[in-house]
Amino acid sequence: MAQRQPLNHELSKLFNKLWDADVNRFLPGKDYSISLQGKADFVPRGSNVSRDSASEPLFCSVNEGRLKNTETYSTFSSLLDNYETSTGVAELVTPQEMAENNHFLDAVLGTEVMKLTHQYLVKKNWAKPDLKDFKSQLYVIWFHLYSRERGKGPDSCGFEHVFVGETKRGHEILGLHNWVQFYLQEKLKHIDYKGYVARKNKSRPDEDDQVLSLQFSWKGHVKPVGSIFIGVSPEFEFALYTIIFLQSNEKVTRQRVRIEEYELEIVVYRHGLYIGTAYPILLSSNNEDLF
């Protein structure tokens, strides 16, 4: 069994600072409520058959006014329909979509979370001090298109994989680690929540937990285990994954951190100069996320 890596105290301190600075975070019981319902069964990867342990959606309510009127959420939401979700199908980025990407980056760069992130990265010499340079760097890391399948045209980017989700060869869900996309897709009845994945030594997560492992189907495909932050702002996730991506040139970077009461492993896969995937794992969970 792989030895658990030591806690990264420097990143834990920084990420808690970002958590506290995240004024756009939705709070459980105030800005949203969820219904965990039953514990999901084990489903092998690649299977599209799963017992539904949750007859109702995960999200009972979300403050839609706040979603629409908070700039980082509204600009983020406008990006979610810009992608062809099947890998192997080439993406075409229109001038309007490029403008939407830039509006989103401008919105997140105006937040305290991303200002603190930029300061940290400059101090580490992983980003340039000029904001325009930093924005260009973020654009390349997150929005530059690349190919996930050999011999096919550019069909993916880090943003699409992590925040929107993709399907592979019509039978497997890749990515989709974002609560806003989950909620919006659930509302459209494209996502069917199947139940929570229990953490070891804790038979059931709490409905105010802001990190969950869960099982769901999307457009007919099953995700056996998906790890997801609930309620955090787009800029918070963007910051965490960018920091860990820029730390290392390794194919996979894993950092064990403690954020609030959550002991997590933040995992970032690199696709050359770009983000391949990124997600949190609850370390007390029985199952690692199937990315």
Regions found by a protein language model. Give the residues of each.
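Compact beta-sheet-dominated globular domain cores
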Residues: P234-F291
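N-terminal "domain-start" segment
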Residues: M1-V257
